[in-house]
Amino acid sequence: METKQFKAESKRLLDLMINSIYTHKEIFLRELISNSSDAIDKIYYKTLTDDSLKFERDDYYIKVVSDKENRVLKIADTGIGMTKEELENNLGVIAKSGSLQFKKENEVKEGYDIIGQFGVGFYSAFLVSDDVTVISKAFGSNEAYKWNSKGAEGYTIEPCEKEAYGTEIILKIKDNTEEENYDEFLEEYTLKSIIKKYSDFIRYPIKMDLTKTKPKEDNKEEFEEYKEEETINSMVPIWRKNKNELKAEDYENFYAEKHYGFDKPIKYIHTSVDGVVSYNAILFIPETTPYDFYTKEYEKGLELYSSGVLIMNKCGDLLPDYFGFVKGIVDSEDLSLNISREILQHDRQLKLIAKNIKTKIKNELESLLKKERDKYEKFYESFGRQLKYGVYSDFGSNKDILQDLLMFYSSKEKKMVTLAEYVSRMPEDQKYIYYAVGESNERIEKLPQIEGVLDKGYEVLYFTDDIDEFAIKMLMNYKEKEFKSVSSGDLGIEGEEKENTSSSDDKENKELFESMKDILSGKVKDVRASKRLKNHPVCLANEGELSIEMEKVLNAMPNNQNIKADKVLEININHDVFKSLKEAYEGDKEKLKLYTDLLYNQALLIEGLAINDPVEFTNNICKIMK
């Protein structure tokens, strides 16, 4: 028996493959089962081109057998088998794939696709074994051969006995080390779990003899073990079934089986696409937020299959971050894989699938909003924040995709409204989309700044999420209507000059406001008569792009830089408090300072900002009460 050398740079390549390409040892079983499936596919293909042959499905299967005592694991199939020449060509050359060659030479028909595209899958056996034997008998041949290798040094091929055609791969499992427990690859439970995880949708039965117990015949109180053959895999994936044959319950059961969440999905999308790229997908929109969704630990992504074989547990490239809440699977035969099924190339097919999926999700959410408003609002309570992050991120490049999905509470109704609904009912004289920012709807309703806008009969959107205003700054406008905060220095309301403070009033109180500005030096940019206040004596407005609420959010972040918005103290000159200010200005400068500090701190409290010196503030209140 002659030992032959591998025809590639065997040692270096084999070491590279074992140590670098595959990051999880358990995938060896996935690779070997996929090869077995390919071998049966080749038999099926022959029956399509040879009328004298018949394909009896029950005759074709894959068997996994564990022998713990001898530390042997066997994977057998009833596939096409290999001749001596094929054993040498396919297994003697690392990185040569018989499946790939077969695929090139033959046109695969009727939805059957050869899974294997590269020749290193078989060599993943060396992840768990340092003694690999292959016994194979080719279809239509009377001769069988045994191929054996103990690593990169080479291999042997010799004749052997085998009754039926097909292939057996026999692995002598490695002994345990301090770093690795190889015993688990002989355990029934582990093997069954790996098959379910990676190969559940291989289209041929994967069988195992499972250990079970039953009462002894002579003593029912005692139990004995016995073996029973079971098919481990489901074979037909739900996404390849006819949608008309499936019920909502089938999708909900699949959602639960895949452990996508403890809730029921609020919506599912089952799609089959044929075109430039072909794929099947089932996508789920959850009802509730996963506990870790808004943390760094959360990992987005869809399960990615190639011809029913799991390639990646979470393929993040298939989902944009703003749709990261979507769960589900994608299965495609068009994906280009590199030499391991674990790592996917960032190729054109994947990008096309991702683009298509993004559009599908967007359309489904828009449909949900229009046709099932209650469901959409429930979804939005859980994931609306993520959509707003999507608008804000990437410098607003996704705003056109997401803007019609946004919702906010408003002064008009006690429920959420869309931007389209807001704009559709704007009065003709209203130039802007007005919004107010606060911790809650109740707090916003009490804001002094909102009075002037509401008095004009204009609707105000309520921003209660810290991301809201940042997202709107990126959105900039909606249907050519700009957004305007009720705290803006200029509200852009027609006729506000006539209805409130006249220019003569501003001139008359100029010296008073200058004195108050000096008292608050460094704290406010200006003090002026308010054009928005009706019932309240004072409020803070802001000038520039940075609002007071944005200041609060940014300063609450780690490593804040003490960012400050440009604030303006606005005084209601029609309020009784203003009379007290004028009297103090004319007769008691100390009292003017006292009143000014009190009003400024009052305005800070209304905005939810911290008072610089609470003790001084309380002392000032006590002075007034004496």
UniProtKB/Swiss-Prot annotation:
According to the record, the residues making up region (C) are 553-626
The answer on whether this UniProt entry bears the keyword Transferase reads no
Protein origin, superkingdom: Bacteria
Return the annotated region ranges for A.
1-341
Which molecular-function annotation in GO is an example for this chain?
A: ATP binding
Gene3D superfamilies (alphabetical):
3.30.230.80, 3.40.50.11260, Heat shock protein 90, C-terminal domain, Histidine kinase-like ATPase, C-terminal domain
Gene Ontology cellular component list: cytoplasm
Q: Which UniProt keywords apply?
A: ATP-binding, Chaperone, Cytoplasm, Nucleotide-binding, Stress response
Q: Where is the composition biased (Basic and acidic residues)?
A: 498-509
Could you confirm whether the keyword Isomerase appears in this record?
no
* UniProt xrefs under NCBIfam families: PRK05218.1 (NF003555)
Function in brief: Molecular chaperone. Has ATPase activity.
Give the record's family classification: Belongs to the heat shock protein 90 family.
| Name of the protein described by the UniProt record | Chaperone protein HtpG
Question: Which species expresses this protein natively?
Answer: Clostridium botulinum (strain Langeland / NCTC 10281 / Type F)
Q: What is the lineage of its organism?
A: Bacteria, Bacillati, Bacillota, Clostridia, Eubacteriales
